[in-house]
């Protein structure tokens, strides 16, 4: 999978240890969708150049703690929001409550980003045990935007398992 480093929202970033369904905390920080090209918040800019863009959230370290569920969201906002702060702006995507047992290392959430009025910044946020009562002690994710969501897995000899010569 090709990953553009300027479209990386979280690189093995630690999950926030609190938050609720109405107070999601940013994971990894915000990325500037407009960069230094001076476009501003122009909703007519096609960020994907006519092709679908995908948000990929990948669990790298299994969440641990007394939490029962976790919730991931994506937001767009006119201002940058730092990691650990409450997410703000327009919600683009929500996973809904996910049981901790369903978040093993390597689990990926892949969603086609909607056509929307994107503000300048994009962020991924999360909330530990959004139903209340639990906390998260550890847990990490990668999150990025890509056009290539092929779920390719390398092998030790770099030869696909379907190659008849192996």
PLM regions: where:
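Surface-exposed, low-hydrophobicity beta-strand/loop segments enriched in small/polar/acidic residues
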Residues: 1-166
